[in-house]
């Protein structure tokens, strides 16, 4: 919604502007003038603030609600004497629901109380530590003062003694010796005082640290005990299933005790048994003496098992994979499948016992039944293999990967051809590119890797793959043709991959070239030139004369410097499959663009659903190489099969693990494919009902590379209409084999070979079965011929053309034909074999056929314009003068797509 001003909003809600500005300020939104604009998010913020201010968020609902359910049932219990009696069983269940806001308030209150308690404990601990420290310091100070006084007294006494001793032998030097003795005594007293103070201070610090440690340990012990008590209370309140099971078991045991008491009371009321014999002993000695209904021998008590029901529910660790059936889940939890289905129905999910459920649903069900869930990923091996890599080296600058994109016949391959100084466009059938070509060229400023993509509309997936694996997209636009559909699609691919664009305006040397028109048309799709303030470089080039090629390469290198492209050179390689095909002599061949690391001959490569050891590597010119670094395209041999274009190629350590991962991926791919085929949705029901009325053209496609197979399949499927559908019975890479021919014969399909041929065994089957085999090298021709085949299966269209018109001049009566109209042919010709319409006042009143056409009593086959004739209409006698008889014929028109 568009923004509105504060004044307009105040008018809409009928409130003064000053009040609305104050409300904005209260809500935390800075609005000071009536002309300020208000966005939709600010309106929502103001509305939420006003609701909260006026109590609009509160819901008038009870904070706690208890629901009670009572079910009654009757069970048949076998009593004494073989008679059954009916026992009424009543089960009462109670469940309490608490409003989330009330729970949150209680939780917040509990958290506040817990925080206050912890703060009080922390404060008490700090006070205890501070008190202990002050006591220790005071005690140390007193001890130091006492030690100082003792030291001074001791020093004074020793000084007096030394003075007296010095006076006896030498009274002549009395004054000088006495002064020196006093100085020495004073120094000794000060040293002793300092040592005693230091010892007292150290002792006080140790005592304070010890008391602080004791206080901390006491606080930690109390905190752990309090946390355990809190967790126990929370667990007891949250474990709903355990408490429910306990109550159910207690109720069941109480019911069993009541039944046993009533049965014993009834048996005692019948009278005492004969003395001297116990019934249990007699039954144990002679089992046949105790017979039940229909004379069957009852089971002795000694043969009955002594199993007791568990007193509480057993909580298990349930291991759940990515998918699991309901029966397997019930088996892991040791419950019946019916119980699991009941829980799922309560949760709102309908399932059968053999239905496969996903991991999240199974986790919810298991936790609902009180078990602990252990989730297991089935692709753990795959993740472990892909994560076991040595990528410790630092990243270094690498060459840019540039994709050439644009509309068909705009000169993409010719431009690249001039750069590579080789003739490639002439080698492509029809002069159009039908494969992704990967090449690298050395320039004066460095290496550049080019990917040449097809421009034809059928190769959308190829162009998307090229944009995904690239760093820079060069958009080639013909200066004389302008922006075309595939140009727009290339812009969309580049923006989806977030790749910068460099626009090359080609064919600039033509007289009708108009580069300004190209800039204007591209500006509609947010591709702005740097001259117009945008961020896209526009380079005028000519693939024919070579004009502007150096400028284009310089623009590419400048863009790559801005991107600061780096990659790990050393270590295990990682890349993407650009193209793949099946070579008759070499086997599966994949063109891989190395993105990081170094790919070496002999490495083990995991590539999508395939794996293998690299037996040989070749560059784009067919030369054997031993290793390839980042941004280099190479052909590798040695894979187990043809990988899909766009798959990630990764070097791994162990070939055995790579094989396991590839087999796991193949199994998952097969499961997904089968699930997609078997999924019958409600919206497809009517389409399936009318499926028998739709004609189908079955096609078996074989091509030279995987990308061409995808492009042809997509293009043919898009040709399908409501009346005729194209069904791809089979597709693959490589020559046409006997298996393909047999498949085409079984499904009455057309065999299509795109740049491939049939082998000898396949040709025998084709001749024997008279199959329709067609070879193509240009995708245009293939699509056109399939269109013609589909047109032949369309139901024809019928059109009615008026060939004559006769006017009734008079009406005669005939005993044989009834009313006969005497007519004048005014337009065209009246033929006896065609159908007619009778018009009165230009309104059709009858439609039928002629019974008789005569001229002068002679039967004729046709009467031309300007002649009179007699016309008898079959089964119609209400012909009047002035009516018109219109003669028409039905023409069949063949429809086309």
UniProtKB/Swiss-Prot annotation:
It is found in: Cytoplasm. GTP binds at residues 406-413, 452-456, 506-509. Residues 506-509 are annotated as: G4. Residues 431-435 are annotated as: G2. This is Translation initiation factor IF-2. It comes from Aeromonas hydrophila subsp. hydrophila (strain ATCC 7966 / DSM 30187 / BCRC 13018 / CCUG 14551 / JCM 1027 / KCTC 2358 / NCIMB 9240 / NCTC 8049). Gene3D superfamilies: P-loop containing nucleotide triphosphate hydrolases (3.40.50.300), Putative DNA-binding domain, N-terminal subdomain of bacterial translation initiation factor IF2 (3.30.56.50), Translation factors (2.40.30.10), Translation initiation factor IF- 2, domain 3 (3.40.50.10050). Residues 287-296 have a biased composition (Basic residues). It holds the Pfam family IF-2. Residues 452-455 are annotated as: G3. Keywords: Cytoplasm, GTP-binding, Initiation factor, Nucleotide-binding, Protein biosynthesis. The keyword Protein biosynthesis applies. Residues 101-161, 180-196, 203-217, 226-239, 277-286 have a biased composition (Basic and acidic residues). GO terms for cellular component: cytosol. Residues 69-88, 95-304 are annotated as: Disordered. Residues 162-179 have a biased composition (Low complexity). PROSITE patterns: G_TR_2, IF2. Residues 406-413 are annotated as: G1. One of the essential components for the initiation of protein synthesis. Protects formylmethionyl-tRNA from spontaneous hydrolysis and promotes its binding to the 30S ribosomal subunits. Also involved in the hydrolysis of GTP during the formation of the 70S ribosomal complex.
